[in-house]
């Protein structure tokens, strides 16, 4: 039977991608259905209890700048906050928060349940309704049919999921949850390229059985960083410590002794695992010269006895897990509450997606999260928001939201996936962004919030707060440019001891902040020049904009040059074999990828600048040259 209400957007899956997708579509006014196999696990952290990190924190800030939920939820559920790379430049500084799983999940559910235009329904999705190569709805496990104009699939590791512990394996989406077999079969029957990936998780330990006195204590930052641009420190629950210990040569011997029963090393697991979050088996094999590896002992919550030993993900048999855990300093009497395991699952080649995350073969069908080959909550959430927004925009007949590589890490993420694909779980790093000085955590709102407000993703409260901050920055920068200090100025006596070289000529306050030894805060402490602006985030923005102005201007010049032909459209049915001078390999790659623009074509692996030049000349010669008119943020 058909459900009586028709929706604009249906989102399948209630994880990090699914919740952001459903919330985005609903915020934009689309009637949205979030279909999940269990409403109790909305926003569940299936692996490590943490949000953020290098590159990942940047994505969280961008999600937040567009009105998303992840940063708000971790501010309410974070039990330890740290700024990584705090001694380095602003481009690579990143926020990371340890999470209380229960508090984080509750925060996400609260946001979902109070979102207008969003309906929750608990059922697995077993089938898609596709008519004339366009998705028109879904069919649930009990045969109930829902109609919609767009469908977003965000099913994580559930598609054909198989859990491995030693040589034993069974079907599962994650420990304790069933897999999605029928939907996996349905998607495999469509013309998408499909393969398998693998990820894993460590055993969970009973905190009461660990000896913390022999471990290194790791405290959070004080004062604590705040993740959301709308957040405040008062949102944070009680803060607690993490701990650090290490594997040793005995641990490694135990692991080597169990490799003959490892599903990874006996060929049982075919999927490729994450390069940057390898299992402990992989670590001792790939880094055989190392006699120890670091383990972060992370609490799972304020009221939980479980800890997450980050660094010893494994799918070894339980008896080997037991021995290796107890060989570690501080874990000698550890009780394992849940065994570690690996999970193998289906993913679909993201080169079969448009930059909107809509599939190229089925109109109205969008993919987001691990189904596209990524790993990590943050990568999933970022894709979910973009997919949900574009599903809504398509329903409204509006131009899509496509973020460029120079505008957002979200743009880098999706561009990498759609143009180059991936053969292993994709993780975001700052090194993936060629314009990372412009894509800092601190300016995510300046880059994206205006666009979010225009699209309906950002509410009025956030918009007003953003404009107040922006005005404060602009007024303060003008004041600093207009205030001059002469060597004989009354404040010079207090100022000179703060400078490497005393004032010898007239300077503006902006000139003084450009000096390496001077900070905005230090200058404002000089009575004649302070107190400055009270919002620390606005003050930080003032200082960064002044100190890095030259570098930022150079990157903007580079972007202007590279963007010249970036948005030149290529006809979707274009026959590349018509172009004289293109090699068969290049013709095959371009025909296979079907890039929408010259910019996308240029980033396909193996496509040379010479090939792009030939393509551009052909398009000009045959009157096919036109720029995209779609909106990009």
Curated annotation (Swiss-Prot):
According to its UniProt record, which cofactors does this protein need?
FAD
Q: Quick one: which residues bind NAD(+)? A: 273-287
MF terms in GO: flavin adenine dinucleotide binding
What is stated as this protein's family in its record?
Belongs to the MnmG family.
State the oligomer form and interacting partners: Homodimer. Heterotetramer of two MnmE and two MnmG subunits.
Q: Which HAMAP family match?
A: MnmG_GidA
Q: Which NCBIfam families match?
A: mnmG_gidA (TIGR00136)
**What is the documented function of this protein?**
NAD-binding protein involved in the addition of a carboxymethylaminomethyl (cmnm) group at the wobble position (U34) of certain tRNAs, forming tRNA-cmnm(5)s(2)U34.
> Can you name this protein?
tRNA uridine 5-carboxymethylaminomethyl modification enzyme MnmG
Q: Which organism is it from?
A: Pseudoalteromonas atlantica (strain T6c / ATCC BAA-1087)
């Amino acid at each position: 039977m058909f459900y009586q209400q028709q929706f604009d957007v249906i989102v399948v899956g209630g994880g990090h991608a699914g919740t952001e997708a459903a919330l985005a579509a609903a915020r934009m006014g689309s009637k949205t259905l979030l279909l999940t196999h269990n409403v109790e696990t909305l926003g569940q952290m299936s692996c490590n209890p943490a949000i953020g990190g290098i590159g990942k924190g940047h994505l969280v800030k961008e999600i937040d700048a567009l009105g998303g939920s992840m940063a708000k939820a971790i501010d309410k559920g974070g039990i330890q906050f740290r700024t990584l790379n705090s001694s380095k430049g602003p481009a690579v500084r990143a926020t990371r928060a340890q999470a209380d799983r229960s508090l984080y999940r509750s925060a996400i559910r609260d946001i979902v349940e109070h979102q207008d235009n969003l309906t929750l329904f608990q059922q697995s999705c077993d089938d898609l309704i596709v008519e004339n190569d366009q998705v028109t709805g879904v069919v649930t496990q009990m045969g109930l049919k829902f109609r919609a104009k767009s469908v977003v699939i965000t099913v994580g590791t559930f598609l054909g999921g198989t859990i491995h512990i030693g040589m034993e394996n069974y079907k599962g989406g994650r420990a304790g949850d069933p897999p999605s077999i029928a939907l996996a079969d349905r998607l495999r029957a469509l013309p998408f390229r499909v393969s398998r990936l693998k990820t894993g998780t460590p055993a969970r330990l009973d905190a009461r059985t660990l000896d913390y006195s022999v471990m290194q204590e790791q405290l959070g930052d004080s004062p604590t960083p705040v993740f959301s641009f709308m957040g405040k420190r008062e949102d944070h629950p009680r803060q607690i410590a993490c701990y650090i210990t290490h594997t040793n040569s005995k641990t490694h011997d135990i692991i080597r002794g169990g490799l003959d029963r490892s599903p990874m090393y006996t060929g049982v697991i075919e999927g490729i695992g994450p390069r940057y979050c390898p299992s402990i088996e992989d670590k001792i094999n790939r880094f055989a010269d190392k006699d120890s590896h670091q383990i972060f002992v992370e609490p799972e919550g304020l009221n939980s006895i479980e800890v997450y030993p980050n660094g010893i993900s494994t799918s070894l048999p339980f008896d080997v897990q037991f021995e290796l855990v107890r060989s570690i300093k501080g874990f000698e009497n550890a009780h394992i509450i849940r065994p570690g395991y690996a999970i193998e699952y289906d993913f679909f080649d993201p080169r079969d997606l448009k930059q909107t995350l809509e599939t190229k073969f089925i109109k109205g069908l969008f993919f987001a999260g691990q189904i596209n080959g990524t790993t990590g909550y943050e990568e999933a959430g970022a894709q979910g928001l973009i997919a949900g927004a574009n599903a809504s925009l398509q329903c409204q007949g509006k131009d899509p939201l496509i973020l460029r590589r120079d505008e957002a890490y979200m743009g880098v993420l999706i561009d990498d996936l759609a143009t180059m694909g991936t053969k292993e779980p994709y993780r975001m790093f700052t090194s993936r962004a060629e314009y990372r000085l412009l894509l800092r955590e601190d300016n995510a709102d300046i880059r994206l919030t205006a666009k979010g407000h225009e699209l309906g993703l950002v509410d009025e409260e956030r918009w007003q707060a953003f404009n107040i901050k922006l005005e404060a920055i602009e007024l303060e920068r003008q004041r600093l440019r207009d205030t001059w200090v002469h060597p004989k100025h009354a404040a010079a006596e207090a100022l000179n001891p703060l400078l490497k070289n005393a004032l010898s000529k007239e300077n503006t306050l902006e000139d003084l902040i450009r000096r390496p030894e001077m900070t905005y805060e230090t200058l404002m402490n000089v009575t004649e020049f302070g107190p400055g602006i009270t919002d620390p985030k606005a003050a930080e923005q003032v200082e960064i904009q002044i100190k890095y102005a030259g570098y930022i201007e150079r990157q903007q010049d580079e972007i202007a040059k590279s963007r010249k032909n970036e948005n030149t459209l290529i006809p979707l049915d274009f026959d590349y074999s018509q172009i004289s001078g293109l090699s068969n390999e290049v013709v095959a790659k371009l025909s296979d990828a079907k890039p929408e623009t010259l910019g996308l074509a240029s980033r396909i692996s193996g496509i040379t600048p010479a090939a792009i030049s030939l393509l551009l000349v052909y398009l000009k010669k045959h009157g096919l040259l036109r720029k995209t008119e779609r909106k990009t943020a």
